[in-house]
């Protein structure tokens, strides 16, 4: 029948391990879970015991289903009940066991969701659901404003002492004031922003997730985190060495080039020209006059000594 979408067909209804299934009307159903995007929770939906906004049971953990309040879905039998007529052999459970309909057509039993994590509710599924939701709520950095973190926090002071001041002990330092110097805004506001950025940061490392973008928060193993840190440290070191080599070559070229422009006027390709830390390709002139020129401003910004003589033409503005 049309319109069923991802309702499973008979042929593949039992293959739970598949990542994709063929639904009705040739609809392909992707069973891979989507990445969870956390956002601030409007309300605190759980506490240590259960769901804070769960339906509260009535007297004797039951609600009335008789008389004018009768609901067909919550009634065992009758003209509009679950069984239409006659009685049921067992008490049907609805909504993962939140509602239990009495086979005898007596009062409806409602599970106490506020006790989902305790033995007061005999429903493993609801207990697991509570544990999962609470874990998400607790892990959500946007829901944690860290208002308890301040310049008086001992752990933060110790981190500042070791990392910023590079000291083993505070000595005569006022660590509260030293900590305040580090932050331009309120400490708790800055900490919240940093934690949120760390939590949402994506990394791309060859040996993690086959080089694909991966949320940093999804890597709980400390050893693997240390390997990632070492990878980025080596990457920074390589880039620094490359930059130093280019600057050394540029400085040497400036010393040996007699024209005083580092050889800029000898370069005809725009890309090759602009890649030099002291040359700029002039895009503003006519095609006949386009050429590579020495750029004193760019040379200064890149730490290259400014040429003393410039016989081949110069470009003193920023790179164009």
Swiss-Prot record:
Keywords: Cell membrane, Glycoprotein, GPI-anchor, Lipoprotein, Membrane, Trypanosomiasis. The lineage of its organism: Eukaryota, Discoba, Euglenozoa, Kinetoplastea, Metakinetoplastina. It is found in: Cell membrane. It is a lipid-anchor; GPI-anchor. GO terms for cellular component: plasma membrane; side of membrane. This is Variant surface glycoprotein ILTAT 1.2. The keyword Transferase does not apply. Residues 308-320 have a biased composition (Low complexity).
